[in-house]
């Protein structure tokens, strides 16, 4: 098992912790949802971003900050 963080974990530590715990993320267009990026936990949708981003990098940065803000707001 790898013990040192990889490139993704360095760039997006909150997303990495989120999906390694019990949450998951969705990235991409979905006919039933307007947001391009979304964060979920077992209770349902906890955060969603905008409909469009200039780049995937932009979407991931917003997702990183969105999950971090949600965690702080809910005292997790």
Question: What label would you give each PLM region?
Answer:
Residues 1-34:
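Short N-terminal "domain-start" leader segments
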Residues 65-76:
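Short arginine-rich
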Residues 38-42:
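A generic structural motif
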Residues 37, 47, 75:
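Short acidic, gly/pro-rich beta-turn/loop elements at beta-sheet edges
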Residues 44-58:
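A short, exposed loop/beta-hairpin motif centered on an aromatic-Gly-Thr core
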């Amino acid at each position: 098992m790898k013990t040192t963080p990889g490139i993704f974990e360095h760039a997006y530590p909150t997303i990495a912790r989120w999906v390694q715990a019990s949450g998951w993320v969705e990235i991409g267009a979905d006919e039933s949802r307007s947001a391009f990026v979304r964060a979920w936990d077992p209770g349902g949708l906890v955060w969603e971003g905008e409909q469009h981003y200039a780049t995937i990098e932009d979407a991931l940065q917003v997702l990183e900050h969105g999950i971090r803000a949600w965690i702080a707001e809910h005292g997790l």
